Amino acid sequence: MGKGRSYMNSYADGYMRGKVVKEVGALLEHMIVEEITTPTIINLEFGSAYDTIRKLRQQETSISFEIIRQFCYVIGYYLYKEIEAVENYKKDVRNRESRLAMLYEMKEKYKKIYGMQAVVVLNLMHQGKDLLALMKRV
């Protein structure tokens, strides 16, 4: 282990990862239940394995910080698209106001979990950047 990296795989690191996985997993599950996206769409568009999506939804602590970072883009992408569709009447919903209130609440939770990373993702989406293309660049 290199100098300065002794915290990795420590109890503190595992504890932190567990807390973050719990929050991200719950938000992802809520998005899937509310039909904002599906595991199949996530797999097709972002290349995330079904097993990874399942583990995150079940809040398994074996999920790495790299996966957590990847899902910052995934969650931000689908939340932004859904909010935009409902706001602009591009998606037919029974109760538009309650749907928007729920989406705004999810967006705030997303920003609380991911902080500055969430702000960057949402700004990229607002600027019309193709997030899927950006994710696939090497």
Predicted feature locations:
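A short, Lys/Arg-rich alpha-helix, primarily the initiator
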Residues: 2-41, 135
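Short, charged recognition helix plus adjacent turn
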Residues: 3-7, 14, 18, 82-138
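Histidine kinase transmitter module recognition
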Residues: 31-34, 59-60, 113
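Residue-level detector of short coil/turn "hinge" positions at structural boundaries
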Residues: 38-39, 50, 79
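Recognition helix of helix-turn-helix/homeodomain-like DNA-binding domains
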Residues: 44-63
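Short, basic-rich loop-to-helix N-cap that marks the start of a DNA-contacting helix
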Residues: 59-73
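Short, basic amphipathic alpha-helical segments that act as recognition/interaction helices
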Residues: 75-77
